[in-house]
Amino acid sequence: MSKYIIFVLLFLCVACDKSLDNALQQAGDNRSELEKVLAHFKDDPDSLKYRAAKFLIENMPYHYTYEGKAIEAYDSIYLQMADEPLPERNKFFKERTDSIRFSDKRFAVDVQTVKADYLIRAIDEACDTWRRTQWQDDYDEELFFNYVLPYRILNEPLSDWRTIIAEAHPYLTEPVVWSKRGEQMEAEDADFTGNLTETESASEGKMVMLDHDGAKVTYTYTVPAETRKVLFLRYTATARRARVALTLNGRSIPTAPLHPANSLKNFLTSRSATLVTLKKGANTLTFAYAGDTIGLDYLQVAASELYHPECAEDYSNDYCQISNKHSGRYLTIGLHPDSLPCVATLKRFVEGDSTQLLRLDYKGYACWGISVCYPDSDFCLETEYCSVKYNSPVGLYHALNGSNQKWVFLPTGDGHYRIMNKDSGLFLEAKPVGNTDTLVQNPYTGKDTQLWKIERKGKNPTYSSLFRLGSALSEALRLFDITGQFEWIGYESSLPPRASSLLSGKTGNCRDEADYTVYLCRSLGIPATVDFTPHWGNRSNSHAWPVIVLSDGKATPFYMGCAPADTVHYYHSYKKPKVFRHRFQLNEQYTRDLSQEEEVPQLFNAPKFTDVTDEYYETTDVVRDVPTDYADKHVAYICVFDNRNWVPVFYGNIRDGKVTFTSMGRNIVYMAAFYEHGQIVPFGEPFLIKGDGTVQTIQRNEKKRTTLKLLRKYPFMGKEDFFNARMSGGRFQGANLPDFSDAKTFYTFEGLTNGNWYKIPVNDEGKYRYLRYIGPMGSHCNINELEFYGTDGAKLSGSIIGTEGDPWASKETVFDGDILTGFSGVSPDGHWVGLKLSLPQQISKFKFIPRNDGNGVEIGDEYELVYWKDGDWALLDTQIAASNVLTFKNVPSGGLYVLRDKTKGHEERIFTYEKGEQVWW
């Protein structure tokens, strides 16, 4: 058992009544620092601060980080990585951290290292923020202590992250509301002196190059009154931390450096907003060359409007009518539109017309959904096709919780409202058409056609909403405007970055993404934390994600790229055996249950989390018999399968020869085990918790034999990933002219790819010298391998031709025989890859494999099939693949199997074999 676990257990044994005194004893030379904190808050007028200090100090013995030169170097490399183009960050980080020697790192327990000044400042900032919130009285103090107050989330090095957020994002505490996007102003439509360049990936196929002194783009922007706007650039640049010079009406405006693209054919949107105040009338905005080459596609002008939430009217409990000041007509939402989307209309008032009776659903900070009154109808008002263009139609569609379906009511002071779309920042306007008005969106000009009256028309008896005005969850919608600045990468990092570095770099893996969101939430006094599954139930690896803690102690996810509480747009097929919730406080129940164990798995070292699986799924309590040889054991562990081993995800207490594992996820195969000498020791047979909660033991049948035909060693998880649709619309062609102007399309791929080889016959008697695959728009022409065959069945060879690919994904990779390498064009559009033959040939067929995980059966690789037998994996047979299908005969039926590739790779997955197919678990 590690020294740290001994420390925790000894501390816990005496912590029941004297936890503060014991923490101070454990502090050693740092005791005086912690006593300064207690003395500082002892007589503070806000008694919450003293209780907060006690809570933190009592729990500091269970929190730690690492210190030393290696840790500082590690953090520095993270920040350097953040300045690299997104596709290159993973490689950059790995290459530079591989050389770091961590032998000098020091284990630093918080109670022995955190100083008084830091802790006092952290407590002041957290408590003062909490006192300013509208929701402080909704929450128990313990929820504040665990999910707002803490100065750290995991074991990251410490920093003053609250101050950093306040300085970087003052908007978050100002009485304003931003639109998610805004009006789009093309560079080529402005006045410019740079070079106009055609490029397929620009929004209109053109960009203006700012690549020499004097090159500039000048926009003229007119507003009816002084107003603030938020500027974003759509641009391309390859220099690290590239700069562009901005002047507004001749006055220089500071801008943040731009992140690099991996080529000048890839476009990015600036991650940091530039806030400007425009004067009444015409304004000139000039973007000029400042030493770095930048291709400017367009300027996006988002709205920033004053909004005072404490003065907002709450319409959520009432049915309402909305009428236009100019025409007096009423917004009308039909129950059965002929087609969707359809244009919304205004009609003259008709007594008793239910289509003019509206339900206003509160969607979070300043935002409302506008729907017909009937609760079983999901038709709502939206900007069609998420348009940000002037005079574009506003219509009806099914509610999808998109920003284009959210509306901001801004009072004008005369009983009317301006109604702004949250996505576009444009305003709802009536457009007369005969006896009705249609609805469009336009910049606000003050016309009566843009002014609206909202009248209450009786109570809404079916009102039910997760959002309430003035709630923590409502406030979190403000963060939705900036969480998109974070860029995910799949890099491997055992230590979380320092919070200040994370908030600056805004990039990382799922853990970092979750931490980033939680820091932002807590800076506003929004209770938030990280939920995690210690290991997926049907694939390798663990996962973590951010959640907002509600006043009842339960939580709702705040997935990156989604509005808070929006789970509809975040789907995958991964199963969670357990979901735990990080907190600052030690889980004393878990520690007591495990206190008699000589050693415990790493997961349960000082467990500062609680089980919340029941908040996510229907679960099952599982009871398993314990072998008599282990009668002296107090706990056992329930495990799921990793690539090679059984991994513990929870424990159960043993009583009367049985162990009970509570609240386990369903549709997952498990194994019960003990933990001895640092190893998992399975007992019994694997078992499946089925979808209905019943438990099925997986028992092999040695007498009943069967034949297995196997295609893969691991399930294809890519079917939910973004790249799986990238070949839809891609064309395979032959031609005799090098520019393919005479191209004949052999085949067009439609739909989603499955990660396996495709073999396509070609019914064409023509002969072609040039052969290619051309990807659809937005796909980067992703394809991993491509083979063409002649009429004699032989694979054709020739000179590799095509467009430019990324350095790590050139066109040559499509013909290198490695299914894990493939082509990726330097920009999303206009790419292709193929062969130039020495002579024209008739094509009989072609084969290709899309982006994939490399887990399909590969010809020439050596495989072994094993099954679970008597507490271990037993070998059944070994084969070298002669095709992309392996056939194993005389196999015991009903078992749990694993197919291993002995030639290469590491991903493997358990499966059963049912009705002639692999069933993955």
Model-derived regions, located:
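Extracellular carbohydrate recognition and processing domains
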Residues: R251-G281, A743-V762, D877-K889
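Lectin-like carbohydrate-binding module/patch detector with strong preference for beta-trefoil
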Residues: Y307-N460
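Short beta-strand-plus-loop segments that form exposed binding edges in beta-rich domains
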Residues: T286-I294, Y773-S779, R900-H906
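Hydrophobic/aromatic-rich core segments of domains that either
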Residues: D43, D140, T163-R181, K457, ...
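Secondary-structure boundary elements
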Residues: K49-G182, K457-G505, N541
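Extracytoplasmic
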Residues: R181-H308
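Short Pro-Gly-centered beta-turn/loop motif in secreted/extracellular proteins
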Residues: K658-Q679, E765, N890-S893
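Disordered, acidic Ser/Thr/Pro-rich linker "stalks" and the adjacent N-terminal cap
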Residues: K180, D191-G205, R705-K767, G778-I843, ...
